[in-house]
UniProtKB/Swiss-Prot annotation:
Stated consequence of mutating residue 373 to Q: Loss of glucosylceramidase activity
Protein name, per record: Cytosolic beta-glucosidase
Catalytic activity: Hydrolysis of terminal, non-reducing beta-D-glucosyl residues with release of beta-D-glucose; a beta-D-glucosyl-(1<->1')-N-acylsphing-4-enine + H2O = an N-acylsphing-4-enine + D-glucose; a beta-D-galactosyl-(1<->1')-N-acylsphing-4-enine + H2O = an N-acylsphing-4-enine + D-galactose; beta-D-glucosyl-(1<->1)-sphing-4-enine + H2O = sphing-4-enine + D-glucose
Family affiliation: Belongs to the glycosyl hydrolase 1 family. Klotho subfamily.
UniProt source species: Homo sapiens
Gene Ontology MF: a single term: glycosylceramidase activity
UniProt GO cellular component terms: catalytic complex; cytosol; membrane
Quaternary structure and interacting proteins, as annotated: May interact with NEU2.
Length: 469
């Protein structure tokens, strides 16, 4: 089961989740610094990313892990407030530039291609104080930051992700309030943030296109989180429609404007407009793009970056009471099949990724696809011999092989989440996704490979699985 020649085998991390050094060498505070320092049990045991894996000082150790796996690509993110402590180019932190230059140069020296994320949930606190993603002012701030990164690192970085999981960020931070700033705005904040995230991404893509592409010859996209969604009752028309609506609300709401035509899907617009009207709003809670903005947004991605972890069943749930919220707007309820195995929120459904990839191929004109995250957690304490978890990975690779061979999906890169056990947002250090175990009790933060790391290294060496379908 050999994958296509030149297939990219990667692992991923993100700045706040691994770096630590939260106030080292002139770094400014980000929203997760503020949020975790406030306590209040919003994060498991009030844990913080102040030290995390210590990657800010232990990059050499991370590099050893990368070399041990034989990765072809490594995806990491830049800390916006490490580079620009107040979020603006008014003051530039040279120590931050030096740190990322070293990572990029070391990767290239070792034949590893960097995939760099500009922004992975860790907004500079100064910009959150000015309204964050609910304010239109952020679009310009993000564009300036993106241009700064393109001009500083783009001579060597050719694969960029502007915004990580924009669809998760908008909902978790600004609708449900489970991520910083921690203030819920049910049924309004998520859409407002989505609107600004889409425009910020598009602006930065155009900046790359007009100012840097000719010389640097790179590619720019954003990454979107996607759960595959199946009708709970495959014979029920209302469940079938609900499953389609669910995918549209959570993936296409971002992907359709960017990849197809600059505007939100019709069903999203009509559902939210009709709910808003019933609730007595003077206009839809979903903001509208101007014709000018639609032109600006359309076609602003050079590849499709998707992050798949799990699948859910969907059934139709009429919003009789007119409650506010995104699920209520979509009129859906989601839940797992009781027969699926799970660790925490991740139910193991490897076939879901095959269906998702086919959906992206068919809906978005057969784009080049990167899976920029996929993985399985272990609960703490996690055994180093994680054979059960490796089995989930193996089944996933079989499904990817099928998608490439049978469905002719143009999948070019796979990133395992994550290189290291790390700070998993609200779950703190209780959920371990690493290919390498990190001992968070030991100040030296030693990295030790799980069985999965050794097995993944074999897959990379063979460019695929040894067994046949």
């Amino acid at each position: 089961m050999a994958f296509p020649a030149g297939f990219g085998w990667a692992a991923a991390t993100a700045a706040y989740q691994v770096e630590g050094g939260w106030d080292a060498d002139g770094k400014g505070p980000c929203v997760w610094d503020t949020f975790t320092h406030q306590g209040g049990e919003r994060v498991f045991k009030n844990q913080t990313g102040d030290v995390a894996c210590g990657s800010y000082t232990l990059w050499e150790e991370d590099l050893k892990c990368i070399k041990q796996l034989g990765l072809t690509h490594y995806r990491f993110s830049l800390s916006w407030s490490r580079l620009l402590p107040d979020g603006t180019t008014g003051f530039i932190n040279q120590k931050g530039i030096d740190y990322y230059n070293k990572i990029i140069d070391d990767l290239l020296k070792n034949g590893v291609t960097p995939i760099v994320t500009l922004y992975h949930f860790d907004l500079p606190q100064t910009l959150e104080d000015q309204g964050g993603w609910l304010s239109e002012a952020i679009i310009e701030s993000f564009d300036k930051y993106a241009q700064f990164c393109f001009s500083t690192f783009g001579d060597r970085v050719k694969q960029w992700i502007t915004i990580n999981e924009a669809n998760v960020l908008s909902v978790m931070s600004y609708d449900l309030g489970m991520f910083p700033p921690g203030i819920p705005h049910f049924g309004t904040g998520g859409y407002q943030a989505a609107h600004n995230l889409i425009k910020a991404h598009a602006r930065s893509w155009h900046s790359y296109d007009s100012l840097f592409r000719k010389k640097q010859k790179g590619m720019v996209s954003l990454s979107l989180f996607a759960v595959w969604l199946e009708p709970a009752d495959p014979n029920s028309v209302s469940d079938q429609e609900a499953a389609k609506r669910a995918i549209t609300f959570h993936l296409d709401l971002f992907a359709k404007p960017i990849f197809i035509d600059g505007d939100y899907p019709e069903v999203v617009k009509s559902q939210i407009a009709s709910m808003s009207q019933k609730q007595g709003y003077p206009s839809s809670r979903l903001p509208e793009f101007t014709e000018e903005e639609k032109k600006m947004i359309k076609g602003t991605a050079d590849f499709f970056a998707v992050q798949y972890y799990t699948t859910r069943l969907i059934k139709y749930q009429e919003n009789k009471k007119g409650e506010l919220g995104i699920l209520q707007d979509a009129e859906i309820e989601f839940f797992p099949d009781p027969s699926w195995k799970n660790v925490d929120w991740i139910y193991v459904v490897p076939w879901g990724v095959c269906k998702l990839l086919k959906y992206i191929k068919d809906t978005y004109n057969n784009p080049v696809i990167y899976i920029t995250e996929n993985g399985f957690p272990q609960s703490d304490p996690a055994p180093l011999d994680d054979t059960q978890r490796w089995e989930y990975f193996r089944q996933t690779f079989q499904e990817l092989f099928k998608a490439i061979q049978l469905d002719k999906v143009n999948l070019q890169v796979y990133c395992a989440w994550s290189l290291l056990d790390n700070f998993e947002w609200n779950q703190g250090y209780s959920s371990r996704f690493g290919l390498f175990h990190v001992d968070f009790e030991d100040p030296a933060r030693p990295r030790v490979p799980y069985t999965s790391a050794k097995e993944y290294a074999k897959i990379i060496r063979n460019n695929g699985l040894e067994a046949h379908l």
